[in-house]
Amino acid sequence: MELAQTLSQRQTMQMAGQMLHSLAILGMSSQDLSEHLTEQATSNPFLTYRAPPAFIARGGEDFDAVGAVAAHKPSLMAHVVDQIEMAFTETPDRLLALRFAEALEPSGWLGQSLDSIALAAGVSLSRAESMLAVLQGFEPTGLFARDLSDCLILQAREADILTWEVETLIRNIRLIAENRLSDLADLCDCDIGDIPEIIKQIRHLNPKPGLAFDHQPTPVFPPDLIAVRGAEGWTVELNRATSPTITVREDRFADGTADAKARAERRRRGRGPGAGEALERRGDTLLRTAAVLVARQSAFLDKGPAHLVPLTLEDVASELGLHASTISRAVSGRMIQTQTRALPLRAFFSRAVSTQGGGEAVSRDSLDFVQRTVGGEDRQNPLSDDAIVTLAERAGLRIARRTVAKYRSTLGLASSYERRRAAAAR
């Protein structure tokens, strides 16, 4: 009886350990997973790790998976997408932020004008400017700068050295390159002997913060999944180019060995199949989750963000018979490649707001309502947030006042007091 109980406890502990391992692997990015499997294969002679084809393509036949992982730096896009997911909860915000991220040059500067980004995203210039202000607060400071001067001014402000003289020199940085110290002194209205010290402060700044990240010729953020539009709808598959494999080397294990080292290796060998099974479960969960997202949001893929339908983590978890936290791990940091662009899986989720008819409308509709309402108001008598709430109710949308304020902020719209003051100043 006691022996049976002990065995049962051991089995329970083993199952719990395997479950935790599976959950940990599910939450890993492709790069983190490769690092984890490389470490396992390095410490266990019975395991063979095979890097994803995307990694092998970086180094050709002599590619060293261990060395590559050790030398790995996160890509600029991966770094930025992580911050986007933390900074924004609304899908429209994330999609707009992703548009900006796609416009980044290796230097970390924007490679497109604000006008072109706003046009491509289908938003107003004021909203694009509001989004840029948030993105320029990302780390490292200087990302999303529009040019060299913009980059250096952002960093000087953070370093608390942005005096009038420093800003003047930065905005006339061409004169520094030409060593025209006298002209710079005239612009700054200071002694020429003060200029070298100001230049020294500027030279401590980083003109190209994006270069601290990995810029291999492979995609900066390889998608984990691929969605294809066919005659009968959308289909989803795993991106095998980013899928690693791990196998047990039976030929390296010989029965009959009895020394302590061999017994220790036998125990390590027992963990081999667990890693392989966890990998399979990870791929299966990713694929099933993505299939539900694509099926539910096919109109979003076909027609754009305005056609998102309400969908939460709990909805997907219920359909798959999984816990919401498992779905959260599955979608965190994951990208899916469509025929036009790569999207984060979290872009497929959208919260709902109540309508007077008892149904639900996606929050994008409320966002658009606020934008249209403020855009069409009398400039001399701008609408208060309470007035917008009342108009929304008449239109069949139930939006809280604090939600209106949040949407205004998202759209880059000022308060009614500030809009009235701006109109009076014209």
From Swiss-Prot:
<keyword id="KW-0804">Transcription</keyword>
<dbReference type="GO" id="GO:0016779">
    <property type="term" value="F:nucleotidyltransferase activity"/>
</dbReference>
<comment type="similarity">
    <text>Belongs to the sigma-54 factor family.</text>
</comment>
<keyword id="KW-0548">Nucleotidyltransferase</keyword>
<comment type="function">
    <text>Sigma factors are initiation factors that promote the attachment of RNA polymerase to specific initiation sites and are then released. This sigma factor is responsible for the expression of the nitrogen fixation genes. The open complex (sigma-54 and core RNA polymerase) serves as the receptor for receipt of the melting signal from the remotely bound activator protein nifA for the expression of the nitrogen fixation proteins.</text>
</comment>
<feature type="DNA-binding region" description="H-T-H motif">
    <location>
        <begin position="312"/>
        <end position="331"/>
    </location>
</feature>
<dbReference type="Pfam" id="PF04552">
    <property type="entry name" value="Sigma54_DBD"/>
</dbReference>
<keyword id="KW-0240">DNA-directed RNA polymerase</keyword>
<dbReference type="InterPro" id="IPR007046">
    <property type="entry name" value="RNA_pol_sigma_54_core-bd"/>
</dbReference>
<protein>
    <recommendedName>
        <fullName>RNA polymerase sigma-54 factor</fullName>
    </recommendedName>
</protein>
<feature type="region of interest" description="Disordered">
    <location>
        <begin position="257"/>
        <end position="278"/>
    </location>
</feature>
<keyword id="KW-0535">Nitrogen fixation</keyword>
<dbReference type="InterPro" id="IPR038709">
    <property type="entry name" value="RpoN_core-bd_sf"/>
</dbReference>
<dbReference type="GO" id="GO:0003677">
    <property type="term" value="F:DNA binding"/>
</dbReference>
<feature type="short sequence motif" description="RPON box">
    <location>
        <begin position="400"/>
        <end position="408"/>
    </location>
</feature>
<keyword id="KW-0808">Transferase</keyword>
<dbReference type="GO" id="GO:0000428">
    <property type="term" value="C:DNA-directed RNA polymerase complex"/>
</dbReference>
<keyword id="KW-0731">Sigma factor</keyword>
<keyword id="KW-0805">Transcription regulation</keyword>
<dbReference type="InterPro" id="IPR007634">
    <property type="entry name" value="RNA_pol_sigma_54_DNA-bd"/>
</dbReference>
<keyword id="KW-0238">DNA-binding</keyword>
<dbReference type="Pfam" id="PF04963">
    <property type="entry name" value="Sigma54_CBD"/>
</dbReference>
<dbReference type="GO" id="GO:0016987">
    <property type="term" value="F:sigma factor activity"/>
</dbReference>
<dbReference type="GO" id="GO:0001216">
    <property type="term" value="F:DNA-binding transcription activator activity"/>
</dbReference>
<dbReference type="InterPro" id="IPR000394">
    <property type="entry name" value="RNA_pol_sigma_54"/>
</dbReference>
<dbReference type="GO" id="GO:0006352">
    <property type="term" value="P:DNA-templated transcription initiation"/>
</dbReference>
<dbReference type="GO" id="GO:0009399">
    <property type="term" value="P:nitrogen fixation"/>
</dbReference>
<dbReference type="Pfam" id="PF00309">
    <property type="entry name" value="Sigma54_AID"/>
</dbReference>
